């Protein structure tokens, strides 16, 4: 499987591109600020055609370029219904600091939006099959995407990071829900599963089970 990514924009959100191989359909996850340029290069170099934009949640650093990518390539954007309102209001509850940075930015929904309204759903997106788990805690509509490959991969957004977990002090956040999501949806995965988080370095489920101080005793 072809998996690559890059940190996008000021807030350094990891944008990922997944495909079975070069020359096939591709899935784009969390295209943040100024993602179009790097995405075009990756798609062109690997002869990839986007089949979907997947959003782990609706915060601005993860969805900034979703509408542009989706409408440019004519593919749908997938988001949980609890976070759909953030496609047009991604700063809701995000705090004044970020609002000042993006003053004047205008957001609208992509022409094609698909709601991820079924927990445990399986999406067949061209060459890639993605399993969707609703993992509220960081936001009410946060989801994780699990992909079976030679080594399984889970894209965790802002739910789980290397040696830390997602913040829960923004609108819709819940510490109780976050821990339940991690325990019931992530720690049940094989230790070798590669974790691709929304920010920072990749890790594995096993490494976080052993070394993440926020998961001690779980």
UniProtKB/Swiss-Prot annotation:
Query: What does the record say about how the cofactor binds?
Result: Binds 2 Zn(2+) ions per subunit.
Annotated positions binding Zn(2+) 2: 61-62, 158, 199
Q: Which amino acids does the record list as binding Zn(2+) 1?
A: 57, 59, 138, 158
User: Which superkingdom does the taxonomy of this entry point to?
Assistant: Bacteria
Keywords from the named record: Hydrolase, Metal-binding, Zinc
| Record Pfam families | Lactamase_B
Q: Where is the signal peptide?
A: none
| EC top class, as a word | hydrolase
Which Gene3D superfamilies has this protein been placed in? Answer: Ribonuclease Z/Hydroxyacylglutathione hydrolase-like (3.60.15.10)
Give the cofactors, semicolon-separated.
Zn(2+)
* Any one GO molecular function term: metal ion binding
Which Enzyme Commission number(s) are listed? 3.-.-.-
* Listed PANTHER family: HYDROXYACYLGLUTATHIONE HYDROLASE GLOC
Name the family. Belongs to the metallo-beta-lactamase superfamily. Glyoxalase II family.
Q: Which protein, by its recorded name, is this? A: Uncharacterized protein ML0493
Q: Which organism is it from?
A: Mycobacterium leprae (strain TN)
